[in-house]
A protein has these predicted regions:
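Single conserved hydrophobic/aromatic residue that forms the stacking wall/gate
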Residues: 1-11
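Short beta-strand segments of immunoglobulin-like
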Residues: 14-22
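Structural beta-strand segments of beta-rich domains
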Residues: 26-30
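Asparagine-centered strand-capping/turn motif at beta-strand->loop junctions
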Residues: 32-36
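Extracellular/periplasmic metallocenter environments
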Residues: 37-38, 73, 77-80, 86-135
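Beta-strand signatures of extracellular beta-sandwich domains
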Residues: 41-45
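Short edge-strand/loop segments of extracellular domains
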Residues: 46-53, 133-135
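Aromatic- and Gly/Pro-rich amphipathic surface segment
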Residues: 54-87
């Protein structure tokens, strides 16, 4: 038994809810639904990790894997054979097309300065971030 705490998230052009209160050591199951019209990401990381991940996302756009409202999954599979990052198979992240659902189970151990963010190019920059308060 994982001892999960469930959290439902809706993504449009922001996260709902826009912040979380989490106890240190708690395991959360995030059920995420993209109810918007664009591709969005739900990524749990600190700011430095988000900054490091953003060029990978830009490369997915440049290679026409990541489109405004869809993901070319066939192209993603092919590119992932050459560059693992292009497969976007990160345990802390889910990349969702419009009307798509996904989930992440995450244990918040020794986490500092964690935020949930969308690293689709331009989205983080316009404030697509949810605050995570760990106590």
């Amino acid at each position: 038994e994982l001892g999960l705490v469930g959290s439902e998230m809706c993504i449009r052009d922001s996260y709902e809810p826009s912040s979380f209160q989490i106890k240190a050591g708690e395991t959360i199951k995030f059920e995420v639904e993209n109810v918007g019209e664009l591709v969005h990401e739900f990524n749990i990381a600190n700011k430095m990790m988000h900054m490091k991940h953003q060029p990978e996302m830009e490369k997915m756009v440049e290679n026409e894997i990541l489109l405004a409202d869809s993901i070319d999954k066939e192209k993603m599979k092919k590119m992932a054979k050459m560059d693992k990052a292009m497969g976007h198979s990160h345990s802390n992240s889910v990349l969702l097309e419009p009307n798509q659902k996904g989930e992440i189970i995450w244990k918040f151990d020794n986490a500092v300065n964690i935020e949930v963010a969308c690293n689709v190019p331009g989205h983080y920059q316009v404030g697509m971030i949810a605050k995570v308060d760990i106590n």
